[in-house]
């Protein structure tokens, strides 16, 4: 059997290698993937094994000091030593109980009551963005819809000027694009981006300390963890996580779903005729898109996964994109089916590290496609989208499409 290198970002530049994932799920579902430095990691590919690892955060650590929450490539984190020192560890790379303390800090801003309060404003923004998109002609929906909507939502949640959304867009692309030369042109370019972002963060941190408001930036700036106030570097790390997590997942789920609906127009016909299905179809959108390809853990004791022995210290990588197409869980798993119910996807992770903004992301998906269903008869893809060069995010740089009016 050919031994694919799942870490290689070039493997994802044309499409997610679902054929490789399917073969490995059948033949070697806990797969040893060597790395160029002589080490390697266990690739966990089945849905049930991903769930099992995710529910044991102390046995399978996400902590930065144990290796963190993802795998890196030739550029590693892509920051200077000074940059690393200035950016603290985000709570996604912390284990309980500290991880749990951070979740408790941020969750009031993402409670069902709070989300219900902001849904109408999200709808107004989505309607305004869609209203400006010309129908019947080729447009790129990434800068017109997929990117600005979640970033405008984040601007509200963080208490920022909505006009800063494009600046946030460029910063987050640089932070997650360490393997993509379009996003990370040079160390000098990254240093400039980091300097701009650090200045923005310091000003925001000081502002929210001096004048607290009802926003996530205030919650993060004034948090106390283990009885101690957070430092600026911790605020920066968690603000970065909030911007990336709250933007890239929603943005790419919108884009991938439109691509899929252009390929399966019967599913769009169903949603147009039965828009009430969008309350559950958003889970299918995330499952099929898998905006986050993987997360990493480190085994803290000798153990086993799916019958495979795992040694203490071994790297374990959970391939969400594979788990979301697991045929033993999802019938006709490669097919996008808006009538599918009870979708237990792992697109936002699972267990104690499940994405804190998952409800917000699915709400934005529902609102966008509710509005589009009243205006668009079908989506016609004009060209293949350029993809992120990344083993971490399933990202589209552009989405050239015609929105055919009703």
Curated annotation (Swiss-Prot):
Entry keyword Isomerase: no
Alphabetic keyword roster: Heme, Iron, Metal-binding, Monooxygenase, NAD, Oxidoreductase
Signal sequence residues: none
Gene3D superfamilies (UniProt xref): Cytochrome P450
Pfam family for this entry, one: p450
Enzymatic class: oxidoreductase
Known pathway: Terpene metabolism; linalool degradation
Enzyme Commission code: 1.14.14.84
Source organism superkingdom: Bacteria
Essential cofactor(s): heme
ATP-binding among keywords: no
Catalytic activity: linalool + 2 reduced [NADPH--hemoprotein reductase] + 2 O2 = (6E)-8-oxolinalool + 2 oxidized [NADPH--hemoprotein reductase] + 3 H2O + 2 H(+)
Listed GO MF terms: heme binding; iron ion binding; linalool 8-monooxygenase activity
Disulfide bond sites: none
Binding site for heme: 355
Function: Catalyzes the 8-methyl hydroxylation of linalool.
Family named by the database record: Belongs to the cytochrome P450 family.
Protein name according to UniProt: Linalool 8-monooxygenase
Gene: linC
